[in-house]
Amino acid sequence: MIGPLVKLALTTALVSILFSNPTAAQVLPPAKKAARVAITKGPVLELVSDYLTFFRWITTNPGGSDVHFGIVHYGTDPKDLSQTAKSEVRVNRGHPETMFRVSVEGLKPRTTYYYKVTSTESGGKSDGVESPISQFTTPKS
């Protein structure tokens, strides 16, 4: 006859094994990478203040890794967009589009900035999408 402490130990070990080792049904394979990713809406400036701006844009679902990054490349010279800001987004495999939202901070008042947006997979590989260069001017403080 097995004592109650041994039964408890065996039950605990079994539960631990069952829940710590995910089965194939629990871990989804990476989504198929889209053949072509395109910006379908935006980029739109949601807010422009003297020091902060929010950018939002929507692309077709890029697939691939579950985590992607929206990146804003910006600067005061349209030929030098070397400053960047990025934000992580989780891709919803069941949705045809993905929304990116990135904040850019530390801007100067009454300054014209040029920008473009791109996106990448979590490993840094480009989604192959890039907006045209646009501009905005921050208001005075």
Annotate each PLM feature.
Residues 26-141:
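Short, surface-exposed linear motifs at loops/turns and structural transition points
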